[in-house]
Amino acid sequence: MSSTFDKVADIIAETSEIDRDTITPESHTIDDLGIDSLDFLDIVFAIDKAFGIKIPLEQWTQEVNEGKVPTEEYFVLKNLCAKIDELVAAKKG
């Protein structure tokens, strides 16, 4: 996961105005980093492009809004990176 985390953290720092040094695996993209929905969409688009995947953001948001999963499941970086790794592995299938 560490290379995935580094890549994602770099994308977040480049896409937003967040200092790369403040981004950790425990960071919650919204609560800790203060990323707004527009910036998050830009970040997801950049992640999709960098990893050659399609993050199912609409599905994830719906699951969170319906209370099926806690926001931490998708929006804490270590968990987001694990999901990215799963999507990459599934694509390689």
Swiss-Prot record:
Entry GO terms, CC: cytosol; membrane
Subcellular location: Cytoplasm
Keyword Lipid metabolism carried by entry: yes
Keywords of the record: Cytoplasm, Fatty acid biosynthesis, Fatty acid metabolism, Lipid A biosynthesis, Lipid biosynthesis, Lipid metabolism, Phosphopantetheine, Phosphoprotein
Recorded metabolic or biological pathway in which this protein acts: Glycolipid biosynthesis; KDO(2)-lipid A biosynthesis
Keyword set includes Cytoplasm: yes
MF terms in GO: acyl binding; acyl carrier activity
InterPro entries in alphabetical order: ACP, ACP-like_sf, PP-bd_ACP, Ppantetheine_attach_site
Domain Carrier, first and last residues per copy: 2-88
PTM annotation (O-(pantetheine 4'-phosphoryl)serine): residues: 37
GO biological process, any: lipid A biosynthetic process
Domain of life per record: Bacteria
SUPFAM superfamilies reported in the protein's UniProt record: ACP-like
Modification after translation: 4'-phosphopantetheine is transferred from CoA to a specific serine of apo-ACP by AcpS. This modification is essential for activity because fatty acids are bound in thioester linkage to the sulfhydryl of the prosthetic group.
Functional note: Carrier of the growing fatty acid chain in fatty acid biosynthesis. Is involved in the transfer of long hydroxylated fatty acids to lipid A.
Classification via PANTHER family: ACYL CARRIER PROTEIN, CARRIER DOMAIN-CONTAINING PROTEIN
Protein name: Acyl carrier protein AcpXL
Species name: Brucella melitensis biotype 1 (strain ATCC 23456 / CCUG 17765 / NCTC 10094 / 16M)
